[in-house]
């Protein structure tokens, strides 16, 4: 960050602590939305951001491989999700696989026939599960080639992310879990 010192820059752990404030009125409303409403919102976001047809948006549709998302699209999708659902998404919570894996040497290893592939280690997989619980890391663990990691970002993982966010907001407000 420009103009900050290391002491001023929050760590990942600091930035991702449970909420220490009351939820906003928008967050409270969002926390009560049904799964169907979440799916509809994600559908609207992806149709607008990627120019795809609604019938392409199955739960398992991969953002890059199936829907044609490119790196710049992820930022657009993030902003549209925030606007659609009235929530703020801290940097790295929705799309941050590479950020997690490259943060620590213990989370990756080099391999392959020419030693030219990067694989996520067991420690890296565990870290991904903890930080990005909305992703299906177990399926990725069978072949943890980092080049395949973008396949973890699916329509379903985006809906699960919103469900996890709803749960955090309910916990923050003291409401009982659904």
In which residue ranges do the predicted regions lie?
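Phosphopantetheine-dependent thiolation modules in NRPS/PKS and related acyl-activating systems
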Residues: 2-79, 83-178
